[in-house]
UniProtKB/Swiss-Prot annotation:
It comes from Rattus norvegicus. Residues 112-141 are annotated as: Disordered. This is Synaptotagmin-1. Calcium sensor that participates in triggering neurotransmitter release at the synapse. May have a regulatory role in the membrane interactions during trafficking of synaptic vesicles at the active zone of the synapse. It binds acidic phospholipids with a specificity that requires the presence of both an acidic head group and a diacyl backbone. A Ca(2+)-dependent interaction between synaptotagmin and putative receptors for activated protein kinase C has also been reported. It can bind to at least three additional proteins in a Ca(2+)-independent manner; these are neurexins, syntaxin and AP2. (Microbial infection) Receptor for C.botulinum neurotoxin type B (BoNT/B, botB); interaction is improved in the presence of gangliosides. BoNT/B toxin binds to the membrane proximal vesicular domain of Syt1 (residues 32-51). The lineage of its organism: Eukaryota, Metazoa, Chordata, Craniata, Vertebrata. The first C2 domain mediates Ca(2+)-dependent phospholipid binding. The second C2 domain mediates interaction with SV2A and probably with STN2.
Length: 421
């Protein structure tokens, strides 16, 4: 009866309970549910920011992939470096620090060992430092030269044959030499002969013969000198070796042919006059010969103060006659003048092998006569380095060929020019 007459009253508590239960359940929310809410909010915020970026989705994905790859690569490199350092430290400990030796230590060690070895050698041989210095050095091998000698009694001529050389030392950077031979008689040095230069060889074959006009009655007082040189276009020619043959020791009843070892050359007693460098250029089509006086060096001192006032004269000659004359400016108070002055001569092609260019270096004097320091000539009937220079010019038309020449005594050059008229 009671339940039937008050149905609302019975239902009310149930409703109240139903509404209270959820209310009470939200208050003690679990930690897991709070984290999920925070993550969802962060995710929602990230997505909102992502949508604001003005890039297509595929571009964003590509950027993300590249970033991940960079991070992974950096981590890999760091790990590898750490492992490598540990490995090296371990090896260093095992080897006792051998890797710490640098090149300086190695060189110092080598030097110490070398010094010690020398001391040990001295101890074994029983030689002191003083005794070792006094020990004669082994004679340097300079090669050898084959030559022949004969005398023509009918014409009063000494015939000298330069056949070949062998086992010459290498004086050039390439391990070879450019040898040639000078031949002359002492005490008269005025007449000298030279063979052709043989390029890049230590065993040249010359097969050249030279003739000296000497009466047999005077031959006994002469000494024949044969000297082997290494040719160098831009500096002084180096002498390899020489030997002397006194004529009073030779039996001219038959032809002499023999090998002789080259000896170290004696220092030349002749006074040094200096060297001059000039270039030659010939243009056959225009018939134009150009001589450029470049410079001179180590000239002889002519003035009281130990210097000179040098200038250069150039003569074009043919058959002993002076065809043209030119001269440079004067350089004051110097033994190493620089000129770089050019002079041209008209020489037809058919005459180029008949002319001579005579170059004379003089010391200028305001009051007295200008004294010649030295002289040289190239061209017709020249010999040695001068002939080679002239030949190189003719072999290379239109191209300037520069070369150094050793100045000679004026009287000697004039005598040669007079003979070769």
């Amino acid at each position: 009866m009671v339940s039937a007459s008050h149905p609302e009253a019975l239902a009310a508590p149930v409703t109240t309970v139903a509404t209270l239960v959820p209310h009470n359940a939200t208050e003690p929310a679990s930690p897991g549910e709070g984290k999920e809410d925070a993550f969802s909010k962060l995710k929602q915020k990230f997505m909102n920011e992502l949508h604001k970026i003005p890039l297509p989705p595929w571009a964003l994905i590509a950027i993300a992939i590249v970033a991940v790859l960079l991070v992974v690569t950096c981590c890999f490199c760091v790990c590898k470096k750490c492992l490598f350092k540990k490995k090296n430290k371990k090896k260093g400990k095992e080897k006792g620090g051998k890797n710490a030796i640098n090149m300086k230590d190695v060189k110092d060690l080598g030097k110490t060992m070398k010094d010690q070895a020398l001391k040990d050698d001295d101890a074994e041989t029983g030689l002191t430092d003083g005794e070792e210095k006094e020990e004669p050095k082994e004679e340097e091998k300079l090669g050898k030269l084959q030559y022949s000698l004969d005398y023509d009694f009918q014409n009063n001529q000494l015939l000298v044959g330069i056949i070949q050389a062998a086992e010459l030392p290498a004086l050039d950077m390439g391990g070879t030499s450019d040898p040639y031979v000078k031949v002359f008689l002492l005490p008269d040095k005025k007449k000298k002969f030279e063979t052709k230069v043989h390029r890049k060889t230590l065993n040249p074959v010359f097969n050249e013969q030279f003739t000296f006009k000497v009466p047999y009655s005077e031959l006994g007082g002469k000494t024949l000198v044969m000297a082997v040189y290494d040719f160098d276009r831009f500096s002084k020619h180096d002498i390899i070796g020489e030997f002397k043959v006194p004529m009073n020791t030779v039996d001219f009843g038959h032809v002499t042919e023999e090998w002789r070892d080259l000896q170290s050359a004696e220092k030349e007693e002749q006074e040094k006059l200096g060297d001059i460098c000039f270039s030659l250029r010939y243009v056959p089509t225009a018939g134009k010969l150009t001589v450029v006086i470049l410079e001179a060096k180590n000239l002889k001192k002519m003035d009281v103060g130990g210097l000179s006032d040098p200038y250069v004269k150039i003569h074009l000659m043919q058959n002993g006659k002076r065809l043209k004359k030119k001269k440079t400016t004067i350089k004051k108070n110097t033994l190493n003048p620089y000129y770089n002055e050019s002079f041209s001569f008209e020489v037809p092609f058919e005459q180029i092998q008949k002319v001579q260019v005579v170059v004379t270096v003089l010391d200028y004097d305001k009051i007295g006569k200008n004294d010649a320091i030295g002289k040289v000539f190239v061209g017709y009937n020249s010999t040695g380095a001068e002939l080679r220079h002239w030949s190189d010019m003719l072999a290379n038309p239109r191209r300037p060929i520069a070369q150094w020449h050793t100045l000679q005594v004026e009287e000697e050059v004039d005598a040669m020019l007079a003979v070769k008229k």
